[in-house]
Amino acid sequence: MLNEILSGSSAAVISGLVGFYISKKITNANFDIYVEKAKAQAGAIENEAQLLLYKANIKSQEIEQEATKLYENAKDRAKADLSLREEDVNRKEQTFKRYKQNEERRLQDEVSTLKARQVDLKRNEKSLSSLKKRYEDKIDEALNAIEHCAGMTKEEATRVLLEKVEEKSRSEIAHVVRRYENEAKVEAKKRANYILAQATSRFAGEFAAERLTNLVHLNDDELKGRIIGKEGRNIKTLETLLGVDIIIDDTPNAILVSSFNLYRRAIATKTLELLIQDGRIQPARIEEIYNKVCEDFEADTLSEGEEIVIDLDIGVMHPELVKLIGKLRYRASYGQNALSHTLEVAHLAGIMASEMGGDARLAKRAGLLHDIGKALTHEHEGSHVDLGVQVCNRYNEHSVVINAIYAHHGHEEINSIECGAVCAADALSAARPGARREVLESFLKRVTAIEEIASQHSGVKQAYAINAGREVRVIVNASLINDDESILLAKEIASEIEHGVQYPGEIKVNVIRESRAVEFAK
């Protein structure tokens, strides 16, 4: 068995070796074939490369020959061109030399001619000098003969002649001037009427006559008792704080707020309306509502002033001036609302300045600010003209605005078209029938004077004229004025009013000194 296995294994090994040997021979034979093929291909490539190199050498020789030929041709052309240029330059040089020679000969001829003329001129000059002298001698002889015959000298004759000419000319000039003056007056009147007609027809202003009372509506007459309060505390607080008269009478569902000061009256009216809506009518709540209304009115005046500046399209303006414009809503002059009057003047001035060829925007700006001092009159000393000039100078307003403030009351001459338009518009607005009431204005001046007299004393916090000017209520600082000094202060104010203000009847001076202590429990 073992022998069989060994014999089988030997046969297999021998078969494998024979197969390996045969495959090795076949592989070597194939490799030799590949090598021969590769050598044949390499030889073919080498032959082809040599052929290409040969062709390239031939091509390069042809290109070199062509380049040499082109170079020679270009060289020949350049030489020919250079030769032509040299001939042209030589020809131009010869031409220039001939031109130069001709010009030199011409200049020599002209110089010779000028010298000859100069000699002739000198000869003629001598001849003219002698003729001039002979002419002057003849004129002197003629003048002497005329003076001898006329019996007057040359200066006298000249003066007489000039006097006659001047007399005749003066008469003619006066006639012409008078004719042109008449024509100018007629034309100016026509032009002025046209401008006024244009201004008044293009602007329709509102009529605003201010009253002295405001009406506050009540939902129920029982509210009158609550407004008066226990022992009159509420109404005393209201009148003292607001500085107005609160009139509670038999008028159903209404109370009246009376004051000549439009600003205080408007604040009082708004305060009462808010108190009625709130329902809590007591001194502490009254002060709280009053302070809130004052803050709201300050903001509203600024907002209204900004709207007016934007509507008029007059450019940027300082916020303080804008606020003062809004405050004009609560000022009046001869019963005419100051803001309505100011707006009317601004619009009219803009239209008239435009018709006359001026700056319409500047005229409107000057018209809007011409009475700005009225917004400060009750707070500062001085006329509204001086106050207006001060505030406008402080905020660097245009010189035309300053001139308009002065000129509309005749304090300065009119210096511009815009200023003239403002003055004309102011007169037009004030002279309109029904625009102003003289009696009301005199009353307001009297009441304002009473308040100013009371306010100028030391220790006075506030002073209000009430009851149509028949009573002045003076609120003093309790820490500065004692009870005895209050009596003396009332007498001093009464004496000054007697000597400084003209008024019918009598005026009651009521000095109020209130001491209040406030503390908070925390």
From Swiss-Prot:
TM stretches of this protein: 7-23
Compartment(s) of residence: Cell membrane
Keyword check for Cell membrane: yes
GO cellular component, one term: plasma membrane
Annotated EC: 3.1.-.-
Topological category with respect to the lipid bilayer: Single-pass membrane protein
GO biological process, one term: mRNA catabolic process
Cross-referenced InterPro entries: HD/PDEase_dom, HD_domain, HDIG_dom, KH_dom, KH_dom_type_1, KH_dom_type_1_sf, Ribonuclease_Y, RNase_Y_N
Domain HD residues, every copy: 338-431
Gene Ontology MF term list: RNA binding; RNA endonuclease activity
Sorted UniProt keywords: Cell membrane, Endonuclease, Hydrolase, Membrane, Nuclease, RNA-binding, Transmembrane, Transmembrane helix
Stretches assigned to the KH domain: 212-278
Function of the protein: Endoribonuclease that initiates mRNA decay.
Family listed: Belongs to the RNase Y family.
HAMAP family per UniProt: RNase_Y
Matches recorded under NCBIfam families: HDIG, RNase_Y
Protein name: Ribonuclease Y
Organism: Sulfurimonas denitrificans (strain ATCC 33889 / DSM 1251) (Thiomicrospira denitrificans (strain ATCC 33889 / DSM 1251))
Lineage: Bacteria, Pseudomonadati, Campylobacterota, Epsilonproteobacteria, Campylobacterales
